[in-house]
Amino acid sequence: LFDMKDDYDGTTSVDKAALVYNSENYGILGNSLAICHYLVDILKPETILEAFNAITGSSLTSADLLKAGMRDWTLKRGFNNLLGITAKDDKLPKKLLTALEDGGAAGSVPDVKLLLSEYYALRGLDERGFPKEEVLDELGLTELKARLYQ
């Protein structure tokens, strides 16, 4: 459902943006459905979808669930944009940009430029860090679009 890898190499920046994107969408759903944070980490998305449909009598698909997570994240991002948050604020702390001297991640430093480029493409963000108009249309966030692009 969320295309999460089991064998992810944490020392590389390759595919990390997709991992973050999927983790955020999934985690947001857990928050929205009031599922214990610890359970979200161990339950498969398919299990949550099946339980949601059984409890509510709905017949949501995995695509519906993914879109709900995307919509929730985009709404929060747009709200933060309205409060002044932009691409300039999307940065990692200096400590995370310094290579460790030993351990499993020794020598690895995230390629922030690559990560942000891939992440912005996945999220449908423009160079300012705002959701693109077509993304807002696709997610039905017309009021947010009107406020961001007035």
Where are these regions (language model features)?
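Extended C-terminal regions of large enzymes
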Residues: 1-150
